[in-house]
Amino acid sequence: SPENCQGESQPCGCYCDAEGQGWPQDAEENGDIVCGEXTPC
């Protein structure tokens, strides 16, 4: 499963996959702005 990369290099909540791409996190769960798909981490 992807790791949470929030607070590392993105200004919004996202999950970072093994290839370093960010995927949106559930905004309702963490209350953060959601990243766009495939945003580089």
UniProtKB/Swiss-Prot annotation:
Full protein name: Phospholipase A2 homolog nigroviriditoxin acidic subunit A
GO cellular component, one term: extracellular region
Chain segments annotated as transmembrane: none
Function summary: Heterodimer A-B: Nigroviriditoxin possesses phospholipase A2 (PLA2) activity. It consists of a non-covalent association of a basic PLA2 subunit B with a non-enzymatic subunit A.
Tissue and organ expression note: Expressed by the venom gland.
Keyword tags: Secreted
Highest rank taxon of the organism: Eukaryota
Organism the protein comes from: Bothriechis nigroviridis (Black-speckled palm pit viper)
Compartment list: Secreted
Subunit organization: Nigroviriditoxin is a heterodimer of an acidic subunit A and a basic subunit B.
Protein family: Belongs to the phospholipase A2 family. Group II subfamily. D49 sub-subfamily.
